Amino acid sequence: MQHFRPQLQRTLRRLGRTLLALYLLAIIGGLIADQYVQFRQSDAETQQFFANRQQPIYIGYYNTQQRQMRYIYTEDDASKPVILFIHGAPSSSSYFRDYLSDTNLRKAANLFAVDRPGYGYSGFGEPEPSIAKQAAMIAPILYQLHKQSRPVLLVAASYGTSIAARMAMDYPQLVDGLVLLAPSLAPGQEKTYDVSYVLESTFFSWAQPRMIHSANVEKLTHRQQLEAMLPYWKNITVPVTYFQGADDELIYTSNAAFAKQQLINASELNVHMLPGLGHLIAFKARPIIVPAIVNMLPKAAQYFAQRKQDVVQPQLTAVLPAATSTNRQ
């Protein structure tokens, strides 16, 4: 027995050293990844992307609830309706850059995309788990746009659809239509990876990439946030178009049935399940989605014309900049 004790001790020491080395490697890997995997574009990179396509782009910032928010937009023509794109997780406004450069969309509307709280340049790595608070942080853009009396259509993907739906619930006077891509609407009807819990543990949370931290915080609180929204689905009265890949394994297709059950007061609901596609339909089904967005604009305009509610302007420390005072390429 005594013969095996030193051998066991050596084995345990080797195991301990191996685990420590793996832990340190994971920490170093996370810190390196944080610098190179951010899914965002700086102002200069954004301007260069559109300059390469010989298209103008504007970049704006505003402050709300102790946070600076960034958004990008193609133009601010009062004669056109507005489309605001809201990205999922992890991501940023650059997720929709191919939509903002689409010539058909640019002709039809003013195109805006916002960095959600915790992503891009809206407090990168500082997540806001409350869907209601995120909606409130994005709402100032809509208040400013509605001052010129024009319809606003929200186009959102994945987690961003939860935000868009909450905005239609809480700010019915500001939203005139929804286009939801790979929607995450039903509590618990999405895949959560076990690694999300590990990464948010005490041992790893401080060293994981900031972008992943924002996504994990949202993921682990998403069910609770969606449950809090259950009483308010009846408040959505705008026209809604729903797209999802029939083979989506990240957001379960049961969300489509949930949408049909809950959006009973929507003026119109069209659900499209795309065969052979998974979660990333915003990229793979863009030729289908872009015409659908354009077709939603007259419906949003009709809804806007019928709406007679007053808009109350919130307190802002900065407002939508004029095109002449914003960087342009």
Positions of the model-derived regions?
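Catalytic histidine-centered segment of alpha/beta-hydrolase-like enzymes
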Residues: 277-286
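Flexible "cap/lid" loop of the alpha/beta hydrolase fold
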Residues: 162-165, 169, 178-204
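Conserved acidic catalytic loop of the alpha/beta-hydrolase fold
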Residues: 135-150
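The serine-hydrolase catalytic nucleophile loop
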Residues: 89-101
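Conserved alpha/beta-hydrolase "acid-adjacent" motif
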Residues: 249-255
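Short beta-strand/loop motif that positions the catalytic acidic residue
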Residues: 236, 242-244
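An N-terminal hydrophobic leader/cap segment in hydrolases
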Residues: 16-61
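Conserved alpha/beta-hydrolase
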Residues: 104-123
